[in-house]
Amino acid sequence: MGIPFPAVTSRAVALVLVSLVLCTELPASEIQKGEYLTRAADCIGCHTSNPSRPFAGGYRVPTPFGDVYSTNITPDPDTGIGRYSADEFVRAVQKGIRRDGADLYPAMPYDSFAAMSREDVLAIRAYLLAQPPISQPRPRNILPFPFNQRWTVALWKLANLRTGSFTPDRSRTAAWNRGAYLVEALGHCGACHTPRNATFGMDEDHKLAGGTAGIWHAFNITSDKIAGVGDWSNEELSRFLKTGAVPGKAYAGGPMAETVMNSLQHLSDDDIQAIVAYLRDVPAQPGDEKQPRFSWGNAPAADGDAGTEGMTQGSGTATGDDLYRSLCSTCHGATGGGSSDGSYPSLTRNSTAGAATPEDVVMTILEGVKAGDVAGRQSMAAFGGWLDDGQVAALANYVTARFGNPDVNVTAADVRQMRAGSTTSRTIMILAAQSLAAGAAVLMLGLLLLLARRLRRGTSSARLMFLHRDRR
């Protein structure tokens, strides 16, 4: 039957009105500035689920409490931001409040964007409003109780939301201040790289000491020489931010690879160097690591000289060595050395294989790596649909034992949880939060009952006094 004519007409009128407003209000220079800032903030990374429909939302953002789906930020008047005024847009970005007054879930890092300047926020708005409008409603979030209640967000904001724009430190250089603004506000690095506190806000006492991005581990990027990036040169840090690859140290995967692809590779050299200058000065936050992640693994050994060929997990009959030879050696080499040009990474002296936890190795096997749009990088295929949990565990254990940190081990049960988007620690955290919320609800109910009882007693006492006075 198609769309009813009145619906088509009203929608067409709305789109025409939006286009007329944009043409008269948005100068080209503001749009150009907004394009750069939108890339720096990596808006497309979370607000695009289908590359052919940029900024239309629907991207699944895994959180410790369930899945949140991103909103449509195209100028569509019905499902996007076409009807948002400038003030409403700023309020959404910096305070996490929708146009209708509802609180936005902090999967959007408005606790970082709160420090952005209003001018930068409005420049981003100008760029977004200049994009083609796309009608695409947002899927419903998948959150268990009590996290599906938006009043919990209001409580979260009371504990964690910062106020006030970034204030430059006049005792520092212009580059340092620019880097601080990019890291702390616009680039919202802490959203992934800072651990969370008891209320699940960013733990400012351990700023940039390492956190999570979904199941992936976001590494410590403080100046600590073992746990962080203190032993990296400025050139290595700049190269990693621009390409996601520093042979002999690290290759970005997961959300970090996508951030390089969508955002960091497009930043100016001055801004990259400013980020490096600021990271150099972030106080060191030590971890539990015995040695730097990239220091594990020797030079590639002779083919088959691994001593771990017998590792198996679960129902799979193939050993880790069998799986590596059949699935990995074509790109990474029989001895894990990668390609000579670095486009296929070496697995020795690699921060992923040398990490203290197995999540990134497992997730790399399950999801692959999207890096093909970055110069000098190649994407890696995902094997999650090919291998069962036991085979993934066997391959991951083979890689860490032969090329990385031999103290790391993962089981088929661990892989099953990661594949489902969870970990044991995350499950415990959710149960603890639910128990806390249930306890708070019981306490609130008890207080209400006590108050009601006292009110009844007060009413009864007043009634008795009235009767007594009446009899007299």
Q: Which positions does each model-derived feature cover?
A:
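Active-site substrate-binding loop specific to GH73 endo-beta-N-acetylglucosaminidase modules
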Residues: 56-61, 195-244
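C-type cytochrome heme c attachment motif
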Residues: 39-48, 71-72, 87-95, 106, ...
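Axial heme c-ligation environment in periplasmic c-type cytochrome domains
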Residues: 59, 67-83, 88, 94-119, ...
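Short, low-complexity patches enriched in S/T/P/G
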Residues: 424-434
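Sequence/structural segment immediately N-terminal to covalent heme-attachment motifs in c-type
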Residues: 29-49, 54-62, 157, 167-197, ...
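An acidic site on a long C-lobe helix of protein kinase domains
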Residues: 30, 42, 85, 116-120, ...
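A generic secondary-structure signal for well-formed alpha-helical elements
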Residues: 41-45, 50, 97, 128-135, ...
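Post-cleavage N-terminal segment of exported redox proteins
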Residues: 1-30, 68-71, 92, 97-100, ...
